[in-house]
Amino acid sequence: MSLPHSLFLVIFGASGDLTRRKLMPALIKIHNGKRFPEHFAIIGCARTAYTDETYRAYLKEELIKSGSLTKEEMETLDDFLSTVHYQSMDPADETTYSLLNDRLKELSPQYENNGNYLFYLATPPLLYELIPKYLHDAGLLKKPGLKRIIVEKPFGYDLASAQKLNKIYAAYFKEEDIYRIDHFLGKETVQNIMVTRFGSTIYEPIWNRNYIDHVEITAVENMGIGTRGGYYDGAGALRDMVQNHLMQLLAITAMEPPAKFDKNGFRNEVIKVYQSLRPLTDEYIRDNVVRGQYIAGDDRIGYREEKNVHPDSRTDTYVAMCLYVDNWRWQGVPFYIRTGKQMPTKVTEIVIHFKPAPMQMFQMKEGLYKGEELIIRIQPDEGILQRIAMKEPGAGFYMGTMEMDFSYDQHDQETGDAYVRLLEDSLAGDPTLFTRSDAVDESWTYFDKILDYWKKHPETPLYGYPAGTWGPKEADVLINRSHAEWTNPCKNLTHSNLYSKL
C-alpha cells in the first residue's frame, strides 16, 4: 500500500463534533509528520454557510480552545489550515451535490488531482444510505481516479438494516474501498495484543483452553449519555458497544494467527471467531445475558431523567454476558464481556485468567490462590500487567502475588491516536484494520437473536443500578457461576485490584 500522488479528503459533517474533536486534531498530526500525499487537500461539507476563510478561522479557534495542540502543532497550524477548503451544501439534499462536484473540479488543477477522492461520513447514520447514491448520481464516482469511503459506526441498527447498507455500498464501491471504521482497532494497545500473543514465546504456547480458565473484557464509562439521548434511547448498550467494539476485542483475543498479516489474512481470522461463537437459544440468552439501566445515585440523575429519553424507557445502558468460542483452542473457556454507562470509572481492558497449578503445594495466608492474571489495559493508563505467584517474605512457604507491569506513560512512550492510524491507513489504501462486510453480517446475525428475544419477551428483567456503581448484582451472579469475580479496576493500571476511582 502506498500514498497516491494526489488526493482529496471530502468530509461530510465538517461542522460537527466528530470533525472538530477527532478528525482535525488527527489530520494535523499526519500533516506534521509529512505523511499526506504530495498533493493533498481537505474539503469540508456541511449546511453551515462558511467560506474557506471563515471555516479555517472557525477550526483555528476551536483547535486552540481545545488545548490539545502541541507547541509544534500551534506553529504549523496555519500551514495545515491552508490545505482546508469548504463547500456549503446539504448532504441530505441531492440537488446540492452538483455544487460539490463543481468545487472539486475547480480545485483539481491546483492539486494535480485526477479524480482521487476519499469521502468521510462524519454524519448522522440516517444519511449513510443516501450519500453513496447521491455521490454516484452527481458523477462524483466516475473514473478515472480512486474512490474510497469511510463510514463511522453504527453500521446498521440490526441485521436487516446492516445488510441493506452493505448492498447499497457494494453497488457503488468495491469492498476493498469501503472503510467501516472502529476506532478501537486503531489503538496501539489493541494492536499490541496480537504482538503479545503471536510474537511472544512466553504467551503463545499457553494461549488456549489448557492454561486459560476464563477471560474478562470490560469497556465502561463513568459518564451518562450527555446530549445523545435522542440517538441512545433508540440504540442502547448492546448496539452501541457490544456488537462492534467488544466483539472486535473478543476476536483479537481469540483469533488464530493469520497466515499473513494483511487485509484478508487478519480479517479472515476475525470471521472465523464470529462463526465459532456458541449459538444463542432463548434459554441461553435468558441464563447468560444481563441487561441494566442506571438509576439516580451519588448526585447523578437516572437514565430516564436524561434529556430526550422517554420517561418509561426500557433501553439498556449496561450489558454483561457470557460467551463461548466453540473451537479446538477455546472449547469450554467462558468469555465474560460487559459494558455500561455511569460506572465508577472509565476503563477498557482485557483480563486473561490463567488456571492454577494442578496441585496446590503452597498455601496463601488468606483465601485460595486462583491463578495468575494478565491484564491488557486499552485505556486509560495504557499498558500490560502480569500478576504472578511469589513466595511471601519471611518464615514458611506462603504464596503471594507480585505485579510486573509495563505502562506507556511511565516509559514516555506515546500510544498515538487511533484516528491518526486509521486515517493514515485509509489514505494509503490499507483496509486491514477496518471491518469487512461479512464481519458486519456475522456480528449482527449473532446479536439480532438477543434483540429479538428482548422484543418477544418484554418481561425480560431490566435491572436498575445506581449511577456510580459497577452495575446490577445479577452480573456478579453470572460470573460467580465460574467461581470467578469481575475485576473492577481503577484508572491506574498498577494495583488496580486495590481501589477504584469513584
Q: How should each PLM-predicted stretch be described?
A:
Residues 1-151, 155-502:
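Secretory/organelle targeting and membrane-embedding segments
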